[in-house]
Amino acid sequence: MAAVNDMPGPITVLIVVPTLDAGAADVGAVELVRILERTDHRAIVVSRAGRLVADVIAAGGEFVALDVDTKNPLRMLSNAAVLNRLARERGCSVIHALGRSCAWSACIAARLAGIPFVTSWYKGFREQNLFKRLYNSVMARGARVIATSEQLAQLVNDRYGTPWEKIAVVPSCIDFQPFEPGKVTPERIAALRKSWGVQPSTRIILVTGRIVRRKGHHIAVQAAKRLMELGLTDFLCVFVGEDRGHTGYTGDLWDLVLSTGTMDVIRMAAPVGDMPAAYAAADIVVSAAIQPEGVQRAILEASAMARPVVVSDLAAGPDVILTAPAVPESRITGLRFAAGDAAALAAALLRLLSMPEPEAAAMGQRGRAWVLGHFNTSVGTEQILRVYGEIVPRTGQPAVLPRAH
């Protein structure tokens, strides 16, 4: 294995990401810029413009606007030519793609430029047909394939036969400084509760994730219905994600809320700018994903804020949330349920809502200690630089790229 600094000097990484808004890959691109810039390397980010462009620039990266979020083959080829030229002009050592829609252009450009191609997986992808499988397969064609969780690494190996020596597990890592429970003032918490219309005695279940079907908000609604049937009414499920144009699913959710009679315990709130306060206001934080996810930043952030978490078995692996029977009950940092099983989610929520406050607080503190020790930026920096060090040639000559399988 290459050493962390086993590179021929400072390198320039061309990071290609479909958008720079709020998704896991978008935020991951910004964190990658921070890692590179603070270790005396250089980052160039190519993407469609978005709210995180300012963060890229503030972190020391260079931003190049290009609409790489496309499935049009002609546009992909055109983008590949632009990326190839950019990589050659700026002396890039690696092209790193953080999404499928941009990865084909990035892959072609890397081959044209004679430099390594790297991909990062932040979630699993559905493959309804052979065309979809081919489209997704570009994410397994890198000289290194980075998976943000052990679950995703296993998926890449199982689905595409990618050799384990080409797969690197590099979890999303967080700058935890803003997520310090003691730094969140009561006024910030009160302001959020007021904006959500929450009564003082009401307990908050914060449901994370953008409003898209794969995040499982409909499972949370069904679980809320089951809690009501058990006689619980002193809780409120707050959805704080954006729908980003997925109005069809949002409409389906509203229909489900109306048909289940859960209007009084479901709140579809606007996206929150003060997430540390949102976690602090919550009694429980939930991720109900029904498709494989990487290491979700929201779960790491919630754990850092010492909140008990409930996750589906596709939302976070055992490396993120410690649950029984993998660890003794005295060491668990949250609860896990079978993805798509509303009854199991309701049972997990009922257990936490019924738990004595000191016991729930202790669980939250264990979660905080775990994520701060295993998902901090120092760990992420070492891991990502090791990946680059393994593939960037020390001679400075173009790398010999492996043939796609």
What is each residue range found by the language model?
Residues 45-51, 174, 208, 236-251:
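Glycosyltransferase donor-sugar binding loop
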Residues 111, 117-147, 154, 161:
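A conserved, positively charged/aromatic
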Residues 23-31, 203-226, 251, 343:
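A conserved mid-protein helix/loop that constitutes part of the nucleotide-sugar donor-binding site
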Residues 151, 173:
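Carbohydrate-associated surface elements
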Residues 322-342, 351-357:
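Conserved acidic donor-binding segment of nucleotide-sugar-dependent glycosyltransferases
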Residues 250-270:
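Nucleotide-activated donor-binding/catalytic signature segment of Leloir-type glycosyltransferases, i.e.
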Residues 45, 308-311, 316-321:
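Short hydrophobic beta-strand element within catalytic cores of glycosyltransferases
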Residues 97-103, 121:
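Short His-centered aromatic/hydrophobic patch
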